[in-house]
Amino acid sequence: MIADDDEKWLAAAIAAVKQNAFYMQRAIDSNNLKDALKFSAQMLSELRTSKLSPHKYYELYMRVFNELGTLEIFFKEETGRGCSIAELYELVQHAGNILPRLYLLCTIGSVYIKSKDVTATDILKDLVEMCRAVQHPLRGLFLRSYLAQVTRDKLPSIGSDLEGDGDAHMNALEFVLQNFTEMNKLWVRMQHQGPSREKEKREKERNELRDLVGKNLHVLSQLEGVDLGIYRDTVLPRILEQVVNCKDELAQCYLMDCIIQVFPDDFHLQTLDVLLGACPQLQPSVDIKTVLSGLMERLSNYAASSVEALPNFLQVEAFSKLNYAIGKVVEAQADLPAAASVTLYLFLLKFTLHVYSDRLDYVDQVLGSCVTQLSATGKLCDDKAAKQIVAFLSAPLEKYNNVVTILKLTNYPLVMEYLDRETNKAMAIILVQSVFKNNTHIATADEVDALFELAKGLMKDFDGTIDDEIDEEDFQEEQNLVARLVNKLYIDDPEEMSKIIFTVRKHIVAGGPKRLPLTIPPLVFSALKLIRRLRGGDENPFGDDASATPKRILQLLSETVEVLSDVSAPDLALRLYLQCAQAANNCELETVAYEFFTKAYLLYEEEISDSKAQVTALRLIIGTLQRMRVFNVENRDTLTHKATGYSARLLRKPDQCRAVYECAHLFWADECENLKDGERVVLCLKRAQRIADAVQQMANASRGTSSTGSVSLYVELLNKYLYFLEKGNQQVTGDTIKSLAELIKSETKKVESGAEPFINSTLRYIEFQRQQEDGGMNEKYEKIKMEWFE
C-alpha cells in the first residue's frame, strides 16, 4: 500500500463521515429519527473500507466514535419522549449493511441496558453473539472494541443497580471473556492479511493495536465479585487457554504481560503453578525472560510492601515453583541462547534475594540450577552471556555486602568456572574490591582459601602463561589489589594467622614469574608482622608442633623468597632475605639468620651482575649485618670478611672506597662492648683511603679532568673518622685526622675541586664541637689543630 494513497483514502473517508455526521446532527436537532438512522448508517458504512492501514483505520474509527456519542444521547432522549426502546432496538436491525447495523445495535444496546427494561445479561449476550457476523480481522476488532467501550460501565456486578439475578456478575464475566477471546482471534488473524513480503510491517501495525485486546483483561480485573476462587477456577484458565492456543508470539508475549500487570499480586501468588505451567507451552520465540522477570518483580515488590504476605510465599512454595518452571522453560526451548537462560536465573536470584534473603540454601540452589544449564555450553564466549553471568554473581554480593557470606555458597565458584579468562578476572576484581569497600573481616584460613580460589583469575593464569598483550598499567593495578588484600588479612589468634599465611603462600607461589615480584613481598611482610607479635609473647605458646612459631614461619619464608630468585628477581629476593635475617636476629635464631645471609650472599655472587645493583645490594648487606647481634664471633667474622671482600671488588674505585669505609661500621656497635674493635675500624678506613689515593692519582693523570670526586672521597673519609672519634674509638688519633686534613688542603690547592662547600661544612662542624662544654665532646676535638685548615 502506497502511503500517499493511504492518505487520500483516509481524507475521502473522513470527508464522507463529516458530511453524513452533519446531516445526522441536523436530523437529531429536528427529532427526525428516520433520517438520523439513515445518515448514521451511511456514516458507519465508511468503516467497511479495506483500503486503510490499521493506523489510518484507527483515525477514521475515532472520528466515527465521537459522532456515535451524540447518537447515543439522542436515543436516550427519544426513549424519554415515549419511544419504545425495544422497538428502537428492533428498528436499527433493518440497516442495510451488517457493519453499520452492529454499530447501531451496540449503541442502542447500551441505552437499552440503562433503561432496565430488560436484563443486561440478555442484551450483552445478544450483542456479543451478533458481532460474530463480522469476521474481517480489522473491522471485527474495532467493532468489538466499540462494544467493550460502550458497555464497560453497564456490566452487572455485585452491588450494582444492574445486578439482576444472583449470577449476573458471572454473566458479565462470561461476556468479557467471550469478547476477549473473539478479539484475540481477530487480532491474531491480522498477521495473515496481505502479502508475505509485508509481514514485518503488519506485525508492527498489529503491535500498535494490542491495547484494544488488553483492555478486556483490565475490565476483568475491575469486575466486582471476581474473587480469588473465580479467578483461579474460571478467569485464569480461560485466558491462558486462549493465550496458549493462539500460538502467536506477539499475542502470547503481550497477553502474559497483561495478566501479570492487571491482576492483584495475591492472585498471582495463589495461582502461581497455573500461570507458570503455561510458560513452557508458549512459542519458542516468545521472550519468556521478560514475562517471568515481570512476574518475579511484581512478587518481589509485593513481599517488600506487605510483611503479612511473606508467610504466604512459604506456604505456596513460590521459590520451588519458580525454580521448577524456569527449568522447564529452558528444557522446552532447546535453542534458548545462553544469555537468555542466565538472565532467567538472574531474575530468579534477585527474587530469591529479595524475598528469601535469609535462605542461603535457596540462593545456592539457584546457582546450582544455573550451573546445570551452563554445563551443556562450556566456557562462555558470548560477551552478552558473560556480562549476565557477572551480574548474576554480583547480585548476592550486592545484597549481603559480605564476601564471607558468598564463600558459603558452594555453587558460586562452579558458576565462575564458565567465565572466560578476562571476565573471570573482572569478577575476581569485584570480589576483592568488595572486601575493601565493606571492610570485610576474614577470620579463618578456610575462608581465605575459598576467597583466593574464587579470585584465582586475578592471581594466576588459566593456561599457565600470561598474555603478552596485557596492559602493563592494568596489570600493576591488579596485582596491587592482591597485595592490599594480603596486607589486610589479620586476626588476633596467632595460630590461625599462621595458617592464613601458609594458605596465602600456596596461592601466591602459583601466580607465575610476572606476578611473584609484586605479590610475594606483602606475604613476607605479613609473616614478619606475625613473627614480631610472637616474639612479644611467651616462648612457644602453642607447643613445638604448632605452626605459629617464628622458626617455622621463617623456614616458610626462606622457601618462599627462594622462588623469586628463580624468576629473575634477585635484587628483590636479596632485600627480603635480609629482612628475614633481621627478624631471625630479633628472635635469637642464629642458625636461621645465618642461613638467610648465606642465601643473600649467594644471590649477590651469582645473580647480581650490574655494577649499580651491586653497590645498592652491598649497602643493604652491610647495613643489615651491622644491626645483627645474634651471631657468635666466628659466624660474624665470616660474614664480615665476605662483605669487606665484596666491597673491594666493586667495579668502580669510588664505589669500592665508599663500601670499604662503610664496612668499618661492622666492627663497632655502640650498645655492645664486645663489638667495638677500634683497630679494625681504622684498618678499614685506611684501606678506603688507599683506594681514594688511587682515584686521585688517576684523576691527576687525566689532564683537564676535575678531581672533585676524589677530594670528596677524602672529605667523606674525614667525616667517618670524626664519627668514630665521637663514638670513643681510641685508635682514631689527631695525627690521623691531621694527615688526612693536610692531604685535602693540598689537593684543593692543585685544582678547583668543587668540594669546597663540603669541606667548609665539615670545618664548621669541627669548630662547633670544639666549643661544646657539655658531654666532653670538646676534649675529643682538642686533638685536632685547626691551623692545618687555615
From Swiss-Prot:
Key word Membrane present: yes
Family matches, as InterPro entries: Vps35, Vps35_C
Membrane topology of this protein: Peripheral membrane protein
Residues bearing PTM N-acetylmethionine: 1
Ranges in coiled-coil conformation: none
Sequence similarity: Belongs to the VPS35 family.
Oligomer status and interactors: Component of the retromer complex which consists of VPS29 (MAG1), VPS26 (VPS26A or VPS26B), VPS35 (VPS35A or VPS35B or VPS35C), VPS5/17 (SNX1 or SNX2A or SNX2B). Component of a retromer subcomplex consisting of VPS29 (MAG1), VPS26 (VPS26A or VPS26B), VPS35 (VPS35A or VPS35B or VPS35C).
Protein name (record): Vacuolar protein sorting-associated protein 35C
The species this protein was found in: Arabidopsis thaliana (Mouse-ear cress)
Primary gene name: VPS35C
